[in-house]
């Protein structure tokens, strides 16, 4: 994982220059060119020997936080000159040098946020991947023509007020002389899916196995992380490895529902599994650290991030693993949230699925990326592969809607979300995991008797006389100022509840 900041017409302080360092700890570099300063902090994943950024060639400068999985194919397809480094990201520089345009972005298969400067045209170009897996913030000070593009909010001085997330799947061109936007374009072009849903997800995992560093999997025991782990194990076995080579990790409080199912999945798959159990106090006391690193005050995002943050910290401190697979994004792509059962119509379900994906950069994918990368690890998120998303969402919505669990009796809860996905992968997991009802990670880290959401609400009311949301905002504002980082409060739809926890829904069992 890497972090970068680009400063236009701004004399940066070292604190601001190096605030992105928490996203990458192998190397840091600063480059000043024309009226721009580039700061880059690198964690080597591919190209561990020589992948130093910023890349500079023929008056073109590039910084990129990302992984381009099809870089070898692009070098061959476009007859590009050989890479000067082993970094997959350098293909972006090579493509721009050849075509002097941004039309190539739709060909990039991966996750990325990058900034590219052309000294000949004086244009700064910055872009973000389809679903915003990699973070990118933009800040302007219009009165003085100052501008900052950065992986982290920590790069922005308190005097800069006009700060926002870069829209996912967009590319922007800035005239660095006038500090004006010349174009803001959605680069994504949808293609007809060439793979089945099953093959697309398997291929999504397979290409993300590209790494020169050890690989592990977050395994909560839910469908999503368990399915990704199963595919990782199967691909590793095909390559001559052993299931026990794959390390899996879970976390929770005493009695956490996830810990039980994570062990069932790990035993079935044969992975080397580690689980950590912490008391409530450990979860609560780390919330300020979590808010600092995820750069959000959204309630459900903070709740879910604590477990993610703790397990990532432990992986960093106790293993040599640098790349971590996760199951995030499946609920947005596959209408997996429990409230989906209450959708009034298939049309409403379809609109909600599109809405969730359009805004995932502010919520679930933010949680996963920030919690993991803040500990110097690389998050791999196969469910947000653009080809898999395209394949899955091309299936008729009637097939993707919640359906009856196979073999369920009339007395049982029969509707289950992600039914279509589960059917594609029968045999990949034990049935009690494959057909396990949705349990949000923010809920599964706790027991049913003492749910995480009630623990937090009671704690803040008793200790501070404030709501959970008020406390989170105060912590965030004290660190970053009053920046509107979320467009709305995440809440379940079609439900009679005032809390985002799925355990407050009538359909929760």
Regions found by a protein language model. Name each.
Residues 1-296, 318, 322:
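Cysteine-centered catalytic environments shared across enzyme families
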Residues 17, 89-93, 389, 422, ...:
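Short, well-structured alpha-helical segments
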Residues 431-437:
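A short alpha-helix-loop-beta-strand transition element characteristic
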Residues 8-11, 120-125, 133-136, 140-141, ...:
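ATP-dependent adenylate-handling active sites, centered on carboxylate activation for C-N bond formation
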């Amino acid at each position: 994982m890497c972090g970068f900041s680009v400063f236009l017409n701004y004399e940066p302080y070292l604190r601001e220059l190096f605030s992105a360092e928490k996203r990458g700890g192998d190397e840091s570099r600063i480059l000043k060119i024309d009226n721009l300063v580039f700061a880059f902090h690198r964690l080597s994943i591919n190209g561990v020997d020589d992948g130093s950024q910023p890349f500079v060639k023929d008056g073109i400068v590039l910084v990129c936080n990302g992984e381009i999985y099809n870089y070898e194919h692009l070098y061959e397809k476009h007859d590009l000159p050989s890479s000067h480094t082993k970094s997959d990201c350098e293909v972006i520089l090579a493509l721009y040098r050849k075509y002097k345009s941004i039309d190539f972005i739709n060909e990039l298969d991966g996750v990325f946020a990058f900034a590219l400067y052309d000294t000949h045209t004086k244009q700064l170009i910055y872009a973000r991947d389809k679903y915003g897996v990699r973070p990118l913030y933009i800040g302007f000070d219009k009165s003085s023509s100052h501008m900052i593009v950065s992986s982290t909010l920590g790069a922005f001085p308190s005097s800069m007020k006009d700060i926002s997330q870069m829209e996912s799947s967009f590319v922007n061109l800035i005239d660095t002389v006038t500090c004006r936007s010349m174009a803001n374009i959605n680069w994504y072009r949808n293609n007809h899916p060439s793979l089945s849903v099953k093959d697309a997800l398997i291929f999504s995992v397979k290409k993300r196995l590209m790494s020169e560093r050890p690989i592990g999997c977050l395994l909560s025991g839910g469908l999503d992380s368990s399915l990704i782990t199963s595919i990782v194990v199967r691909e590793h076995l095909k390559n001559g490895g052993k299931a026990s080579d794959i390390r899996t990790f879970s976390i929770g409080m005493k009695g956490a529902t996830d810990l039980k199912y994570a062990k069932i999945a790990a035993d079935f798959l044969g992975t080397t599994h580690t689980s950590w159990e912490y008391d409530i106090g450990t979860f609560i006391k780390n919330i300020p650290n979590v808010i600092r690193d995820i750069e959000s005050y959204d309630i459900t995002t903070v709740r879910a991030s604590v477990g993610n943050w703790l397990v990532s910290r432990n992986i960093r401190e106790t293993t040599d693993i640098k790349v971590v697979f996760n199951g995030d994004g499946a609920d947005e792509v596959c209408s997996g949230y429990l409230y989906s059962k209450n959708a009034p119509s298939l049309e409403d379900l379809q609109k909600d699925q599109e809405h969730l994906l359009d805004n995932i950069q502010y919520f679930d994918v933010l949680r996963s990326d920030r919690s993991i990368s803040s500990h110097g690890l690389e998050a791999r998120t196969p469910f947000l592969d653009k080809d898999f998303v395209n394949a899955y969402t091309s299936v008729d919505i009637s097939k993707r809607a919640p359906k009856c669990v196979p073999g369920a009796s009339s007395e049982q809860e029969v509707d289950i979300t992600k039914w279509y996905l589960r059917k594609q992968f029968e045999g990949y997991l034990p049935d009690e995991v494959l057909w396990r009802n949705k349990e949000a990670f923010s809920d599964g880290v706790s027991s049913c008797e003492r749910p995480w959401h009630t623990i937090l609400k009671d704690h803040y009311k008793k200790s501070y006389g404030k709501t959970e949301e008020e406390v989170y905002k105060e912590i965030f504002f004290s660190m970053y100022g009053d920046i509107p980082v979320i467009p709305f409060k995440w809440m379940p739809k079609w439900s009679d509840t005032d809390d985002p926890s799925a355990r407050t829904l009538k359909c929760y069992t």
